[in-house]
Amino acid sequence: SFGTAGLRGTLGAGTNRMNVYTVGRATQGFADYLNAHFENPSVAIARDSRNNGELFVRTAAAIFAANGVHAYVYPRISPVPTLSWAVRDLGCSGGVCVTASHNPAAYNGYKAYASDGCQITSEAAAAISAAIESTDIFSGVKSVDFDAALAKGDVTWIDDAVLERYYGAVLSKSVSNLSADEVAKAPLKLVYSPLNGTGLVPVTTVLERAGVTDITVVPEQRDPDGDFPTCPYPNPEIREAMQKG
């Protein structure tokens, strides 16, 4: 069922699983909601490293485009905070992140965000859920070809300037008055693991620009991998997830 956290479930066939049909139906319902509440609506879309993420993003973007909702899409994997930033930075009506957060590898999900970049409210979730329930999963979903929508301009890649503004905003919130050069002189050593997710580039970029350069990244968990081979349950609150670090 669709709630404030959107959808989440195991990958597979069926209406209670994550697949192109359930993603498509959810997107149609979200598009109907956005069209009912905004003039010329738009969305930002991102995905993490989970399996089928790119497929679900292309599916969602094509459906939004078919419904007159302009889709701004991150061309590479991106963590949730960068999606929230893009919604606000680009002035979007909403956002979607294809992610199952810290669930095991068999899962994926579809999180919806409001125009403020925050998770949708219970009222919005109820309205979107009603729109989804009224949509036939096979015949009620409008779609176009993703590449055709991209060529037409109904889908737009999010460029690196958006991420650069995000990095700048994060760095501006530093509680330290030290410059990056001063920080670099301090004996700071840090161990970091992205847990095979999306954090490597944004986390190390911000840390290095802040002056923290002695960063050891756990090699087995450095690269994005939807199978999470060294960390079946990628939740940093679970002790086992941090053992290699």
PLM regions: where:
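Alpha-helix capping at helix-to-loop junctions
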Residues: 36, 89, 134-138
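N-terminal small/polar loop signature for handling phosphorylated ligands or for N-terminal nucleophile
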Residues: 44-107, 206-245
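Gly/Ser/Thr-enriched, mixed-charge loops and adjacent short helices
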Residues: 108-241
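Short, glycine-/Ser/Thr-/acidic-enriched flexible segments
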Residues: 7-9, 14-16, 50, 78-79, ...
